[in-house]
């Protein structure tokens, strides 16, 4: 069934989703008049979008029921988390962020507020540059904030968008998993479960770009995987490179390498492989210049320095484990409510530590041969996270989600005992 979806048909499905992303907030805007009603309007908007995505790509009634459950469950998780840890009186207020938040949370919300004000005076297509936005990656926030020009710019209204984004990512990854002949049914079930309830995206009650950015990258990966002609491949690469750059500057390099890898891996001719290597080096230098010009010297030094490589084995272990010990969560929350979002980092660390143990324990049977574009991209993002000076678990988990089909095919249902071992620690 999934083999019937071609590059062109998937592109048509994307246009339908994009059209609804534009139209639904406008249609629901009359109902978004207060904190409660605007939150409900946002939930309805992105619930419809989620169901449409599942219907268009996965099609089966089982998947529709499953993702309905996943959407509602994640909305409840985010709502309970915010009301319990942050602001129990949120819905009787104006929907503004808590004044106790860290500076970066407040400046992001303030930047979006200024963007919405500029749109009201200059039109919906007003574009703020980085200097005016005064926050990193302003490009992606123009898309993230669009629905809330109509549904009101309130903190919790972004929660349903985060849920939709994470579930659309899950749909795309599971779709590619089902198209692969090397993934068995047991592995597919694990991929479906873990991607739809991915620990790093469970606490959706905040304004951040990661769920939406990773969703866009997953769309790019599907386009690359479905492309056959040279035009389709070039178009897919451009799309993936742009959205990867929007999410995190260094990801444009990884998008280029992962796109190039598929052609290189399939080619048997040595001369052609050498030609691909030559083209790859040229492309790498060109993309590297783009990232260097977009970042400060200090930021670039965080990725390219000797210590990053020398300390890589240790950084891999600590990056996979995340914040530790996990029992420090309750003490941290007392210091600042923003630490309450680290709960998903602890959950992600537990999952990733089990992932690491499983690979070490099964290293003799684990195969890194014939990796597909999605897996290469995932490992590339993980590596960039390990090498970065500002390493934190989110940088690693953004890549790890793309490696799950490969990982569960390697360890299969045996992962459960490694997860339990990690959880016990």
Put a short name on every predicted segment.
Residues 103-153:
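Short hydrophobic/aromatic helix or loop-helix immediately within or flanking a transmembrane segment
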Residues 131-145, 150-171, 342-349:
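Loop-to-helix entry region of an early transmembrane alpha helix in multi-pass inner-membrane enzymes
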Residues 233-368:
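Alpha-helical transmembrane segments and terminal signal-anchor/GPI-anchor hydrophobic tails
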Residues 48-55, 146, 160-182, 357-358:
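Transmembrane-helix motifs of polytopic, lipid-linked glycan transferases
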Residues 205-212:
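Short acidic/glycine- and proline-prone juxtamembrane loop motifs at membrane-interface regions
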Residues 156, 173-196, 369-373:
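Transmembrane-helix signature of polytopic, membrane-embedded enzymes
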Residues 181, 217-233, 411:
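Membrane-interface transmembrane helices that cradle and orient dolichyl/undecaprenyl
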Residues 15-22, 365-385:
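Transmembrane alpha-helix segments characteristic
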């Amino acid at each position: 069934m999934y083999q019937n979806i071609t590059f062109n048909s998937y592109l048509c499905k994307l246009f339908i989703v994009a059209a609804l992303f534009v139209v639904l907030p406008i249609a629901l805007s009359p109902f978004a008049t207060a904190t409660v009603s605007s939150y409900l309007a946002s939930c309805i908007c992105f619930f419809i979008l989620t169901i449409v995505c599942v219907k268009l790509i996965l099609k089966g009634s089982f998947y529709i029921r499953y993702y309905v459950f996943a959407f509602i469950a994640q909305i409840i998780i985010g709502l309970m988390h915010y009301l319990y840890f942050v602001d129990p009186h949120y819905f009787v207020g104006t929907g503004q962020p808590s004044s106790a938040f860290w500076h970066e949370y407040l400046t992001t919300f303030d930047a979006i507020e200024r963007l919405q004000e500029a749109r009201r005076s200059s039109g919906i297509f007003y574009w703020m540059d980085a200097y005016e936005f005064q926050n990193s990656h302003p490009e992606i926030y123009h898309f993230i904030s669009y629905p809330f020009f109509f549904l009101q710019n309130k903190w919790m209204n972004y929660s349903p968008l985060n849920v939709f984004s994470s579930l659309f990512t899950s749909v795309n990854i599971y779709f590619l998993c089902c198209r692969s002949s090397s993934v068995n049914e047991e592995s597919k079930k694990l991929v479906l479960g873990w991607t739809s309830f991915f620990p790093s995206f469970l606490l959706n009650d905040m304004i951040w770009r990661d769920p939406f950015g990773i969703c866009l990258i997953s769309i790019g990966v599907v386009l690359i995987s479905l492309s056959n002609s040279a035009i389709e491949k070039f178009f897919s690469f451009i799309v993936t490179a742009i959205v990867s750059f929007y999410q995190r500057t260094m990801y444009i390099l990884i998008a280029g390498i992962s796109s190039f890898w598929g052609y290189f891996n399939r080619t048997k001719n040595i001369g052609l492989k050498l030609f691909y290597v030559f083209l790859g080096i040229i492309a790498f230098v060109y993309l590297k210049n783009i990232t260097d010009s977009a970042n400060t010297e200090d930021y670039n030094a965080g990725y390219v320095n000797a210590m990053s490589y020398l300390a890589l084995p240790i950084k891999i272990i600590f990056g996979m484990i995340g914040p530790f010990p996990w029992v420090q969560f309750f003490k941290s929350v007392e210091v600042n409510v923003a630490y309450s979002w680290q709960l998903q980092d602890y959950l992600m660390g537990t999952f990733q530590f089990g992932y690491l143990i499983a690979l070490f324990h099964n290293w003799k049977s684990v195969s890194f041969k014939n990796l597909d574009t999605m897996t290469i991209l995932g490992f590339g993002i993980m590596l960039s996270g390990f090498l970065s000076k500002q390493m934190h678990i989110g940088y690693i988990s953004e890549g790890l989600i793309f490696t799950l089909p490969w990982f569960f095919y390697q360890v299969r249902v045996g992962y459960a005992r490694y997860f339990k071992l990690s959880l016990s620690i």
